[in-house]
Amino acid sequence: MALLQISEPGESPAPHQRKLAVGIDLGTTNSLVAAVRSSTPEVLRDAEGQALLPSAVRYCADGKVVIGRQALAQQAADPFNTVVSVKRFMGRSLDEARASGAPYEFVDAPGMVRLRTAQGELSPVEVSAQILAVLRQRAEDVLGDDLVGAVITVPAYFDDAQRQATRDAARLAGLNVLRLLNEPTAAAIAYGLDQAAEGTYAVYDLGGGTFDVSILRLTKGVFEVVATGGDTALGGDDFDWSISEFARASLGDAPLAPADRRTVLVAARAAREALSQASEAPLRATLQDGRQLNLTLTQAQFEQLAEPLVRRTLDRARSALRDAGLAVGDINGVVMVGGATRMPVVRRAVGELFGTEPLVDLDPDQVVALGAALQANLLAGNRLPGEDWLLLDVIPLSLGLETMGGLVERIIPRNSTIPVARAQEFTTFKDGQGAMSVHVVQGERELVSDCRSLARFELRGIPPMVAGAARIRVTFQVDADGLLSVTAREQSTGVEAAVSVKPSYGLSDDEITRMLADSVAQADSDARARMLREQQVEARQLVESVRAALAADGDLLDADERRVVDERLQAAAAAQDADDADAVRAAVQALSAATEDFAARRMDRGIRAALAGRKLDEIA
């Protein structure tokens, strides 16, 4: 996402001290932390060289808390106190948590379910905070200093409660959240898709326990998630289970002990992972009773086992396309996320569905964290070599809209701190006006023609009223990403229309400097031009209102009065397009003076009509 370095014209950009910020993929199965080092995003590893941190936390009766691989190893022995896949419970209610089928004792609590453990009742926020704290400590150990903040990724379908729960967990872990970033958007950023002009992309995310598919539309630097889909009960674990069932069939009818089932499952996972690089893989294990599992699993056999599961993911992908109103041919690229996408059968099926080779250059386990790291580095204010943009939390150029006469009404002035929101009321220009065109512009000049056009949209459904009676509230809101949303709402009916745009898209430092310099150099001429346009608008409004008044109540004037008003009206109509502000002002003043008595008589007639047939006590 192109963001901008902002400085006053003529001011040299001051060198910035590098600030440490990280990207965190808080995953259902595994979590990672990444940072930009030597201009390249990379995943940070622990002291043992491991990048992936299993998202598992064990709460021991003696008060000890074990996190990661050691906790996961105790899951079978201590399932009630070893919390895995806690991400599923973030921001969820008791009923939603119980529906997951997880083996925990859930407790109802205001706002969010809690889990009963050997160390008492804990919320998913507290459990997630334990995982985030380990990642924060890892980052500070590797980078050698404190962090200024983190970008944390969340599924695109997370609602407000789930997103707030993620923020709360980060705060408990001592992390300053720079941004919550949608996981598919993070993956797209890692591949540099945000630098493309526009396009529509699919993100196919097959993790250990869940499958998500997202359709992203990139328009002028703005990523929009247009559709999501998936299956929260489908992931790499299900492929392992299919292999383990295949293996168990060779062991006879005798039931397997729980420990043996786990042993076979571990062997199945090893075989699946080996098949990502080989045409066949050994499937071997020794059971507690001495029986031996000794098979060779071929790629063809595995593909037959995997076919129903792969088909389920493709069905979800087709459904997401339908929801987005798109065809397969509309997709410009497919990003693969999640360790399970290493399977050749998955990559081939996805490529056949979308008719294009999926993007697989980056490690699918790491791609989301890498994209988050790039975003975090940008938000921290660090400049990569060769880049001319830097995020500063201010508006570089004023934002406003076009009013009558081609004038700019500034809503948010330049250098306003973001995020920011401003609202202003506008009204109609003509009687019975049922629609209003909203033209959003950017710049410091007084005339729309000298500013940068950002977007246009129409508000329809304004109830018929006399000119100036309708009240349309226009709200400009710029979020922390620099994304501008403009909403126009008619106050009496509630009808509204809106548009979103990235004001910084396609705007360089040089162009900002030029626009600011032009506004200074042309300040006097712009002021004169604005004054002329305002006089012309006033003239048009007066001419239209006088014509309407004459049509309705012209009988209130005698012949001489009508002749004078008509002459002044004709002069004002001729002057309304003149280039001399003084001449326009004089014509307006002359017409106003000629119609003062006429306006008073019209008011008297209106009052008499309103009071006709009413008693004095009714009026009081």
Swiss-Prot record:
UniProt-listed GO biological process terms: iron-sulfur cluster assembly
A GO MF label: ATP-dependent protein folding chaperone
The entry's keywords: ATP-binding, Chaperone, Nucleotide-binding
Pfam families: HSP70
Chain coiled-coil ranges: none
The keyword Nucleotide-binding belongs to this UniProt entry's keyword annotation: yes
Gene3D superfamilies per record: 1.20.1270.10, 3.30.420.40, Actin, Chain A, domain 4, Substrate Binding Domain Of DNAk, Chain A, domain 1
Function: Chaperone involved in the maturation of iron-sulfur cluster-containing proteins. Has a low intrinsic ATPase activity which is markedly stimulated by HscB.
Family: Belongs to the heat shock protein 70 family.
Name of this chain's protein: Chaperone protein HscA homolog
Species, as recorded: Bordetella petrii (strain ATCC BAA-461 / DSM 12804 / CCUG 43448)
